[in-house]
Amino acid sequence: MSKITPRETEIIGWMAAGKTAAEIGTILGISHITVNTHIANAKARLGIFKDTALVAAALRNGIIR
């Protein structure tokens, strides 16, 4: 899981809290498209296809709590 960036980790944390890409974008002051790009990049690096699997992997590996 160390392959993901600090920004991707931050976004995954917000995903785990139930926030949408639009809500995360507002919180972080970035576009929802940029949020979706970060999510897609993290999933591609880890070979994960679903958002829920990304959050589960981050929780399982102690990246987020």
Spans of model-derived segments:
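Regulatory hinge/linker segments at domain boundaries
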Residues: 1-7
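Short hydrophobic/aromatic patches at helix-to-coil boundaries
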Residues: 3, 61-65
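Short alpha-helical "packing" element that flanks the helix-turn-helix/winged-helix DNA-binding module
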Residues: 8-15, 54
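Short amphipathic helical patch at the helix-1/turn junction of helix-turn-helix
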Residues: 14-16, 33, 59
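A general structural signal for well-ordered secondary-structure junctions
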Residues: 18-21, 64
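Recognition helix of helix-turn-helix DNA-binding domains
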Residues: 20-53
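Short, basic, alpha-helical segments at the C-terminal edge of helix-turn-helix-like DNA-binding modules
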Residues: 51-62
